[in-house]
Amino acid sequence: PEYRRVIQDLFMEYSDAVSKNEFDYGHTTAIQCQIQLKLGEEEPVKLKSRPLNPAQEASLKEQLAEWEKSGIIEKTQSPWAFPMVGVKKKDSDKLRWCVDYRLLNKKTVKDAYPLSSIESNLHKLQGAKIFSTLDSAGAYHAVEIHPESRECTAFTTPFGQFQFVRMPFGLSNAGACYSRLVALALQYLPGHFALAYLDDIVIFSDNISEHVKELRQVLDVHRQFGMKLKLSKCKVLQEQVEYLGHLVSEDGIRMVPSYVNKILEWPLPQTGKQLKQFLGFIGYYRGFIPDVAELTSEMNEMKKSAKVTWTPGTEEKFRKLKEKFSESPVRSYPDYKSEEPFILDTDFSSTSLAAVLSQRQNGEEKFIGAGARKCNKAEQNYPSHKGELAAVVMGLRKFEHILRYKPFILRTDSRCVQFLNSLKEVSGIYARWLNFIQGFQFEVVHRPGAKKQNAYALSRTEHDGDSEHVREEELDQEEDVYAVTDSEVEHWLVRNACKSK
């Protein structure tokens, strides 16, 4: 309460960095979005407008008028034309209008600017006690489209043809372009107290007084770069906030209760498509549930059928899966300053590779994260020592950002690393693995699989994913051990932004 007036005064001072209405998007001149077409793909695409009912036409007409008034779009005679799509907003009957740019995206050279890692961002919150999350108003619409690229964004409507002056949702490079803008803005901050993923910004501090100062600095860069915040979506001075689909606090990382409730209330799928949707939804959180793969192994086969046939056994696993999510563990943050080493458990079975990362914190071994993947055909025939090495490499790659520069304990139920070091001549995949492993500092602790419950259980289950047709020389390449990739998360975040904003 004592800081409420301070925060109110702060946002009043930076009122020019706060959106005044739903069409006040801000305007940056720091960067522009340029669409580069692939060589030989310069031929314009011209598609017809899709049929709309009277209510949809009225909604679209209103949207176009507001966009044109705000300088987001302009009339055009472009040879390009794409259809509009109305997306129902979250918890509302209103429509949010987007353009179907799928054919344009196929012709576009992809921007190589990397998105920040979700896992890395979450781990950087370690030690923080106070959080604020900031939501950008319109986000992409603050960025100009390069004049030479505007005609490529043209769209057709019953009210004429228009093109975007500002960057719209739906362009394949929009996320990378906006991420570049936010990174450019945040790099001027004198410290590491703010993180961004697309338009989701979190400020984290260990006390309130410092947090208020840091919030001021973030508001200042928003002012300097012409970006605006949607105040109704900002959460300030919180001990716990939702960030990137997770609930974060001083204690650790949790699943968002509303998402867990959706899982618990999910009806029994009757078609393969419905089952695939369910498995995809829970996949975002599979790093919290070590035995999720065991419970979903049969479902991953069932989803391939048009109609799903449930047995008492598979229906019971579906029920147990929901229970597991209601009892999900808290993932602790990796403590880089602690003298306690990280502990990496790895294991191999004929079906899977598995790894679990933990660390002793406050006298207890705390769970930080887990990963597992299905073995491909070649790996299924590996002898024990080679399979264990494959699991070690997989685990090191998964948690490389944590383990690379800090000594840790490697617990495995085989003398695999000693075997690798004992080889007089090393070539092929062993040479690549050895070269990679030698970049880490660790102590090997032999531990039987029966005592190593986390990684052992993970590797003894079947994991979804197509791992066939992998050549021997490709087996050492990095693989994503979680069900959802960053690019899928970007799509998920943008899709939800379309529905909610």
Residues of each region from the PLM?
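C-terminal reverse transcriptase regions that engage the nucleic-acid substrate
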Residues: 35, 192, 197, 232-333, ...
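Reverse-transcribing Pol proteins
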Residues: 1-113, 194-199, 204-205, 245, ...
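A short, polar/acidic, helix/strand-boundary loop motif
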Residues: 105, 160-177, 361-390, 415-418
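Conserved pre-motif C helix in the palm subdomain of viral-like polymerases
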Residues: 58, 126-129, 140, 159-192, ...
